[in-house]
UniProtKB/Swiss-Prot annotation:
Subcellular location, record wording: Cytoplasm
Lineage: Bacteria, Pseudomonadati, Pseudomonadota, Gammaproteobacteria, Lysobacterales
Designated name of the protein: Peptide chain release factor 3
Pfam families named in the record: EF-G_D2 (PF22042), GTP_EFTU (PF00009), RF3_C (PF16658)
Family (UniProt): Belongs to the TRAFAC class translation factor GTPase superfamily. Classic translation factor GTPase family. PrfC subfamily.
Domain tr-type G: 9-278
């Protein structure tokens, strides 16, 4: 096996998805704790608490206790290298999450035992479906009262349309929680207050028949458990690796992230069965991870990861080959050679200079405004990874300055923050307005907060008469020019220099489409095909 094949086979790159407050960030912390990446897990709850969760590193996230931007963390575990991408749980940040899901090989879905499948989980699941992403499920907060576990499996199967294969099963819950049974190994992991629940610090019985177990959980509970397990094993599906990897079956685990309980069986199973880096489609051909030459794509851009340095970092997923510090690459969109000198690896916000990276790894590239989401880097081959879209925003606001002298900083701030992809920035052709588009209201708050915090600009966002946006294309240059002249009042340019129709109403959009049958109006923009406009 080549060095690239060897290293690629060790990688497990995944994202955690959930509805807000299902305990995703807490679980992230615990996985890092087991991976030896952090010594002391910080709880997300107390906003003024001294320890903040490692993956919520932006000032606003620390203040509000919600994850707003996806973090990237890497840790070694059992001979494998795990790359964990945390995604925002808040509904308004769907696009950021969507793009993170394009950069992973599998996902972990976290469900609150009391709430079951929630609306945001359904949406994220649809995204995973588009790519047949393999999914494992962790049913969290077992230390609280919740729904019947059998009903929960039924709910996941019915609502999300995916087969469940329970791997661990709870022994009671809430006040009566006694532990979990591992349905494949037969082991019983006891739940005891004050334990860390590492392999070294937990009571594990080899089976339900093991002497001493009945004293721990009581005869009645053991009898109930045996009955329940008979029912579960009769009604549910055994784990099937091929069905899981095809995105048709989800292995299910139960536990309590905040208490570390049930997390290690999940992590052990994950590193053993989750897929290593997979082949990727490009505009020209399929790229296999084991190819010798480097290729990768940018799925996220983050401004100001380090307030002291006012920097912007492009997150690149390595798809094939080996990255080494200082290597020369081709930035396909611009056609320029770029030397990747100080690329970073991540442990949430702690960055280290990357000496090398392999397929499945995520590295950070310093970006001075020349790199966009969806950009491909190669060792010279001209190809572009596909399937990384920009969506048309659903809400629009005009930015207004309280201090008109800060216009330059405002333009710079809006352009840089929109590069991250959670908001989009438009400039109408016929006015000096600066219009911001987003998927949800929270994003405008975040931008206003960050403009003030990071750029020293006090701006307010007020309503503007734009209902929706469509990217416009036409193969006939003359017809496009005619369309541009007739509709100049409704046209604008986005941050990538693409022409966009900003429709004041849905009816207006319909009429414009009818009047210009040769012009294509699209609700998404595929990043792979965007060429830079000078």
């Amino acid at each position: 096996m080549s060095e690239v094949s060897n290293e690629a086979a060790r990688r497990r790159t995944f994202a955690i998805i959930s509805h807000p407050d299902a305990g995703k960030t807490t679980l992230t912390e615990k996985l890092l704790l087991f991976g030896g990446a952090i010594q002391m897990a910080g709880s997300v709850k107390g906003r003024k608490a001294a320890r903040h969760a490692t993956s919520d590193w932006m000032a606003l996230e620390k203040e509000r206790g919600i994850s707003v931007t996806s973090s990237v963390m890497q840790f070694p575990y059992e001979g494998k290298i795990v790359n964990l991408l945390d995604t925002p749980g808040h509904a308004d940040f769907g696009e950021d999450t969507y793009r993170v899901l394009t950069a992973v090989d599998s996902a972990l879905m976290v469900i609150d035992v009391a709430k079951g499948v929630e609306e945001r989980t359904i949406k994220l699941m649809e995204v995973c479906r588009l790519r047949d992403t393999p999914i494992m499920t962790f049913i969290n907060k077992l230390d609280r009262e919740g729904k019947n576990p059998i009903d929960l499996l039924d709910e996941v199967e019915t609502v999300l349309g995916i087969q469940c294969a329970p791997v661990t099963w709870p022994i009671g819950m809430g006040q009566r929680l006694k532990g979990v049974v591992h349905l494949i190994s037969g082991e019983v992991h006891l739940y005891e207050q004050g334990r860390n629940f590492t392999r070294q610090d937990s009571t594990i019985f080899p089976s339900l028949e093991a002497p001493g177990l009945v004293e721990k959980i009581g005869e009645q509970m053991l009898a109930e458990l045996r009955e329940e397990l008979e029912l579960v094993q009769g009604a549910s599906n055994p784990f099937d690796l091929d069905a899981y990897r095809a995105g048709q079956q989800t292995p299910v685990f139960f536990g309590s992230g905040v208490n570390n309980f049930g997390v290690q069986p999940l992590l052990d199973f994950f590193v053993e069965h989750a897929p290593p880096p997979q082949a990727r489609e490009t505009t020209g051909r399929r790229v296999e991870p084991t190819e010798a030459k480097l290729s990768g794509f940018v799925f996220k851009i983050q401004a100001n990861m380090d307030p002291q340095h006012r920097d912007r970092v492009a997150f690149m997923r390595v798809c094939s080959g080996k990255f080494t510090a200082g290597m020369k690459t081709l930035h396909v969109r611009s056609g320029k050679d770029v030397k990747l000198a100080n690329a970073l690896t991540f442990m949430a916000s702690d960055r280290e200079i990357a000496a090398e990276a392999w397929p499945g790894d995520v590295i950070g590239i310093h970006n001075h405004g020349t790199i966009s989401i969806g950009d491909t880097f190669t060792e010279g081959e001209s190809l572009s990874f596909t399937g990384i879209p920009n969506f048309a925003p659903e809400l629009f606001r005009r930015a207004r300055l309280r201090d008109p002298l800060k216009l330059k900083q405002l333009q710079k701030g809006l352009a840089q923050l929109s590069e991250e992809g959670a908001t989009q920035f438009f400039r109408p052709l016929m006015s000096n307005d600066l219009i911001l588009g987003a998927v949800g209201v929270l994003q405008f708050d975040v931008v206003a907060y960050r403009l003030k915090d990071e750029y020293g600009v006090d701006a307010i966002f007020e309503p503007v008469s734009v209902t929706t946006a469509r990217w416009v294309h036409c193969d006939n240059a003359k017809k496009l020019e005619e369309f541009r002249e007739k509709n100049a009042g409704n046209l604008g340019i986005d941050a990538a220099g693409q022409l966009v129709y900003l429709a004041p109403t849905r009816v207006n959009l319909q009429l414009a489409q009818e009047r210009a049958p040769d012009v294509r109006f699209s609700a998404t923009r595929e990043h792979a095909h965007v060429k830079a406009i000078d």
